[in-house]
């Protein structure tokens, strides 16, 4: 088995969050990517990986919603 670098783990986590959010909100990949980039969610997930990756996915998705709500990204 090949060990993943820390950087690869973070990237995989962010991708997992994008895919999970897409499925949970019934959005397109392009829509989630645009939303996350516009409001800085992608950067937030990357920078807060150490804390977020220890949480369950439902908690992470709820955290993303709170993050977006504070920044005006949720209608």
Which residue ranges define each predicted feature?
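Generic hydrophobic segment detector
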Residues: 11, 32, 71-75
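N-terminal acidic leader/helix
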Residues: 2-30
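Long, compositionally biased
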Residues: 50-75
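N-terminal, charged low-complexity regulatory/assembly segments
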Residues: 13-17, 45, 67
């Amino acid at each position: 088995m090949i060990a993943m670098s820390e950087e690869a783990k973070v990237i995989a986590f962010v991708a997992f969050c994008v895919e999970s959010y897409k499925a949970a909100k019934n959005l397109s990949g392009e829509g989630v990517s645009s939303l996350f980039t516009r409001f800085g969610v992608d950067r937030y997930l990357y920078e807060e990986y150490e804390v977020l990756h220890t949480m369950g996915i439902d908690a992470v998705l709820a955290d993303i919603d709170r993050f977006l709500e504070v920044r005006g990204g949720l209608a």
